[in-house]
Amino acid sequence: MDFSNKIGFLGVYFNKFTIKSLVALILGFRGRYITVVTPNVDHIVRLNSNLDFKKLYQQADITVNDSRILNLLSKIAHVDIGDVIPGSDLTRKLIENLPCNDYPISVIGASDETIKFVSDKYNLTYLHHYNPPMGFIDDAIEVNKCIDFVLNNPSKIIFICVGSPRQEI
């Protein structure tokens, strides 16, 4: 699938999706994997001052705008970067539209309480969770634990919820 149709704004190239079309694409995707990022204004500032961070965003298959402020700026500049799709809204819509409650999902980050709440609310039976300790990104052993967790828990969706910029690295 070709996701190369992107619109550049402030050094980032955005795909234009509605939340409905993006959820359908993700849940219907049959390829190996796709990477979706949802930058907000803080991310834009950071990636324009950090080349390594910017490369990570450039490598993402799909980039959608997470920020109403960014949306307003794009309108002022007469650049249509698509709908505002906050990562939290996308996550909720994905879970609400899962084809079955045993759809394999993995989550890195978030508290045990949050995972239990989501699992109970949506009756998810195949939800794997690992919450690395604070500062894990500077500890090769902990980073490898995250990688091993993903490899040992095959899932159709993997949510990385450890905060920027750690989740991008």
Pin down the residues of each PLM region.
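Structural motif
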Residues: 39-42, 108-112, 163
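Conserved beta-alpha
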Residues: 71-149, 153
